[in-house]
Amino acid sequence: MENYKGLNAKYIRSESGGGRWEYLKKFPEEWVISYDDLRFKIKPMGFKHTGLFPEQAVNWDIMRGLIKNAGRPISVLNLFAYTGGATVACLAAGASVCHVDASKGMVERAGENVRLSGLGDKPVRYIIDDCVKFVRREIKRGHKYDAIIM
């Protein structure tokens, strides 16, 4: 892996299933990146993730196009929503979003990403809960959404 040009860090997996980051150059603890008009905080975590899955950007583009062209308000249920890449994209396109994840820390980071993108005043509900249990309660309540992201 050291042969990669410009390599700044590498992830070393442990036998127990976790791992650690090894920094080859001075590296910030966290930083902000931009994708179009969206902004996200990146922070390497102990389970190999950085808080964002950039390969999902093509899906964010599709969602944004569908929402913008719907011609009516769209409500989105984002399940297992992590740090909110899809939530930010949908809010930026004009949707209202219900963001659900079991991890309080990830939901807090999603809120931070929403605010970083200048969308803090947009209609979003943050729910810290088991997604399956939440969906069962939503069905009992008769609450429906135009789109569900998983």
Where are these regions (language model features)?
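Conserved SAM-binding loop of SAM-dependent methyltransferases across substrates and taxa
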Residues: 83-95
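S-adenosyl-L-methionine
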Residues: 103-147
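Conserved alpha-helix/loop element of class I SAM-dependent methyltransferases that forms part
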Residues: 54-72
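Conserved SAM-binding motif I beta-strand of class I
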Residues: 96-101
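Non-catalytic substrate-recognition/targeting regions of SAM-dependent transferases
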Residues: 1-54, 61
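Conserved active-site beta-strand-loop modules that form the wall/rim of enzyme catalytic pockets
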Residues: 87, 145-150
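Conserved class I S-adenosyl-L-methionine
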Residues: 71-82
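Residue-level marker for buried hydrophobic side chains located in beta-strands
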Residues: 75-77, 127, 148-150
